[in-house]
Amino acid sequence: MPSPRPRRRATALPVVAAAVTLVLAGCSAGPSGTGASGASDALTTFTPAGSGSVDSITWNVFQGEPQTIDPFQSADYTPNMINSNMCETLLAQTPDFRIKPNLATSYSNPDPTTWVYRLRDDVTFWDGSPMTADDVVWSLRHNMTDKSSFYRYLYANVTSIAKTGAGEVTVRLKKPDYLFNDQLASFAGVVVQKKFYERHGNKAGTPDVGVMCTGPYKFGKWKQGQSIGVSRYGGYWNKSLPRRVKNIDFTFLTDDSAITSGLLSGQIDGTYGPPTAGLAQLKASSAGQLYSGAAPLAVTLTVANHKGAMGNADVRKALQMAIDWKGIGGQVYAGEGTPAALQTVPAVYGFAKEDLTSYAGSVRTDGLPKTDEAKKLLAGVPADVKSKQISLVVPQQAETQQLGLGVKAAADEIGLNFELEVVPATGYSNYLYDPATRGDTDLLYTQFWPSIPNPLAWLGDTAVSGGTFNQSGYSGIDELYAQAVGTKDVSARSQLVVRMEQKLHDEMNPMFPGLQLTNEVWLGSRITGAPAAFDYVYYPWAAHLGGTGK
């Protein structure tokens, strides 16, 4: 999902001039890694398996305290990092970016507009009651009809959801849709207890009420401002998950220094997304281990306004190629970011992996600035277009400010009229979602991840009319996208995805290929086993944790 905030909270720089110096010094043709870079190490899917039982651990969620743990309203790092261990989905997305059956043992597509799900008969909620088809139907319908559900838009093509047997649920669509089924591996397919939600209504997910789900860890106590506690559920159905940690306290520290100190001292046993500023200390410490894994994460710029200079394709292309993406990835993101060939990153290639990998290889870039080429491209742009001011808005945080300054330096170098606007991080999401706030802003910073490892999910959110993250209203691939979503043949669908990516790349619209990020996880010396790959937003990652014997 699009996130207005970096996955690592960073302290805003007090003096912008200091950031200018850092960016211009760091963004160079030199090595992209640094001594602190986890990205220089080989990526791994899982950390070494644990062997011992652990009574309790403390795990920090880096974006602070969630507003709710209601899975229907959870679509960001913090709530999902907690909820993924409590509430499960019909299908599951695994740490190697695959989608498989989960609470549904199987699914079938008997005709182009029908999906049938066979349910497990050994699943219970934390109160011991069995999960039934009625619970599944209620949960899917709630996602479809409740206006507060973040995932409601994914049900726009659904006409009915019905129980068609004791352990069977059937979903009927208005038209063929070969993306919908995969979406049930996100909280679009979450299953909660019907009677619990009917009893508590909109209080579900609040500190006093919590949730009632089927996952490996059950809700315990929410101490507002401090922590959320969960405990191992003894009746959990999936015996393949070791679940060697009995109790987990999720804390809400957001200050870089406090998080780093807590990790080094052992007060915090682990975290995803450790502070970039603390990576050097963490990597050099014997208090634990820093691991890196693949991630469907991109840091980039999205075109928000086609009425100004960014409406010209050559201006877009010139600016993108003038930016020192390699330098930004090495310096600003401590080597965790590498230049991306396409708007969609490899971890999301999914069913189109072979075709997209081939195409990405044909347009791969080293990420170094191509200043002379950019200037030549701009030479053919009408003067009145080239002179229009281009505005970029970024949130007031260290990494994003430095990124913005790197972009401005590139724009200045090739003669564009460029303005960088830094706004409070707490209000930045308004620029992403509110047209009135955004106004005539030309470019916006984004860190993006899709709900599932499927390129159609990425493109649907970012490059199709009505997409949550298509602020400019770009419509250039709408017809191809509709055709792809309705195409059953995987090979034909894959080729349509490549055609869309080609068009987006050729037009440099509506997102720039920016940086693809890795995922980092810090595990203190007492624990191991967590996935290193970015899968903690919908997968029960904590069930893999175990003790090291230390």
Where are these regions (language model features)?
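Extracytoplasmic/peripheral linker and loop segments enriched in polar/acidic and small residues
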Residues: 50, 419-422, 426-427, 457-525, ...
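N-terminal lobe/hinge region of extracytoplasmic solute-binding protein
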Residues: 58-110, 141, 212
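Surface-exposed binding/hinge segments that line
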Residues: 108, 116, 153-198, 221
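Gly/Pro-rich hinge or "lid" segments in bacterial periplasmic/extracellular proteins
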Residues: 186-240, 247
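Ligand-site clamp/hinge motif
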Residues: 235-281
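Periplasmic-binding protein-like
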Residues: 310-351, 402-403, 503-513
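Structural transition elements
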Residues: 338-380, 397-401
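Long beta-strand-rich cores associated with HINT superfamily self-processing modules
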Residues: 521-550
